[in-house]
From Swiss-Prot:
Phosphorylation at Ser-128 by PKC promotes relocalization to the perinuclear region, where the mTORC2 complex specifically mediates phosphorylation of SGK1. Phosphorylated at Thr-86 by AKT1 or RPS6KB1 in the presence of growth factors; the effect of this phosphorylation is however unclear. According to two studies, phosphorylation at Thr-86 by AKT1 is part of a positive feedback loop that increases mTORC2 activation. According to another study, phosphorylation at Thr-86 and Thr-398 by RPS6KB1 promotes dissociation from the mTORC2 complex, leading to inhibit mTORC2 signaling. The CRIM domain forms a ubiquitin-like fold with a characteristic acidic loop, which recognizes and binds AGC protein kinase family members substrates. Residues 468-522 are annotated as: Interaction with ATF2. Residues 279-353 are annotated as: SIN1-type RBD. The modification Phosphoserine is found at residues 128, 186, 315, 356, 510. This is Target of rapamycin complex 2 subunit MAPKAP1. The modification Phosphothreonine is found at residues 86, 398. Keywords: Acetylation, Cell membrane, Cytoplasm, Endoplasmic reticulum, Endosome, Golgi apparatus, Lysosome, Membrane, Mitochondrion, Mitochondrion outer membrane, Nucleus, Phosphoprotein, Stress response. Phosphatidylinositol 3,4,5-trisphosphate (PI(3,4,5)P3) promotes MTOR activation by relieving MAPKAP1/SIN1-mediated inhibition of MTOR that takes place in absence of PI(3,4,5)P3. Pfam families: CRIM (PF16978), SIN1 (PF05422), SIN1_PH (PF16979).
Amino acid sequence: MAFLDNPTIILAHIRQSHVTSDDTGMCEMVLIDHDVDLEKIHPPSMPGDSGSEIQGSNGETQGYVYAQSVDITSSWDFGIRRRSNTAQRLERLRKERQNQIKCKNIQWKERNSKQSAQELKSLFEKKSLKEKPPNSGKQSILSVRLEQCPLQLNNPFNEYSKFDGKGHVGTTATKKIDVYLPLHSSQDRLLPMTVVTMASARVQDLIGLICWQYTSEGREPKLNDNVSAYCLHIAEDDGEVDTDFPPLDSNEPIHKFGFSTLALVEKYSSPGLTSKESLFVRINAAHGFSLIQVDNTKVTMKEILLKAVKRRKGSQKISGPQYRLEKQSEPNVAVDLESTLESQSAWEFCLVRENSSRADGVFEEDSQIDIATVQDMLSSHHYKSFKVSMIHRLRFTTDVQLGISGDKVEIDPVTSQKASTKFWIKQKPISIDSDLLCACDLAEEKSPSHAIFKLTYLSNHDYKHLYFESDAATVNEIVLKVNYILESRASTARADYFAQKQRKLNRRTSFSFQKEKKSGQQ
């Protein structure tokens, strides 16, 4: 090991030792940096300093002439040495040698024509094609599974299996629904079938998915192969079908409805099934009436009372005041709850609170309910749209589409290219909940082609009125449909509206009476 303290000698040693062996470029950086610093310390103009330069054989100073190696090219980054011609040639020969190894040379020889027929026959020997015996090996797992699940192959609802969302929970929007099956036996219908569907599916697709899962699980009885033979109804938590509302529209997406409990009901569309008519019992209450559907006349009056109270209180817990049933024709006489409907010989009853009496004339309504009126009342909850004209304050009209169903009334403007140019015709869509509806009255009927009706509803603690006009037949149908809906619902807003209207009428009557009394005294 040698210790040197002369930077010039050290730099010269690095320069000569790493001319061809430095591939990192580190020596170039050392030479450039230290030579610059050394030049600043020992400028070349200073004479007599023998320690800062090395004398060559020709007597000239060589201290900084060879400060940088001639074989290292200075660049922005590290130095890169160019390859010599010999190295490039050796690399080319190596690649050619590797390519020759990959090639195979075959020597061409002339075919010997003196070959016997036996030798030619041995070249293409005839093989015996015998039928192989059937393989009696073990069956594959797929074959075994297909034999165990024959219903999967013969399921007529396989096309709806793509809407099954059980494998997409957490990754895609899904909806879990409990479906009751009234077509089951009396014990199986109490337990719902849980279905997980894609949120993008329609109601028709959900019906097909329910039928597919029903068939895959091997349930009985078998379903009709036609999906259109079924519909979905709103159901209570105990499986009771709510017939006051129409079935869900098959073309609507399922995510539009927030119901978690539904019932799959068969449509009675064939002529043989149309004779199966439902039985309805009318229950009068203080602010309207309800139609309770029963399967037969063997049902007890206690079951009818429970349904009536549940229908009156809705989703609230059945607690608080107790009620009893009375015949419409026999006031203040309670009905025996253990008796059957058949033994009562009546189809109309009154719901009266315990420890109270029914006043005369409180429930005086037409007790004669024909089947046509019942059908009109039930169909009034089905959605139907009408094209009418909405009358504004300045007496100009706007064409709108009036959609009426059992749960709400929708008013959508019908815009046309001609009407869109007028700045005042900018009617916004309006949606009115049925619980906020108060009244629907015929305002004017001039001719069969022109009539006006008024719709009253509650908005922000204030009663608002909307006026519409159309032909007389359409107006009468709308008024009748809305009034059927209002009579079948015990709306608080409607009761308050009539109470306020009655108070105004009484105040006006008393004022006119006092005025007449004063004029008589004079």
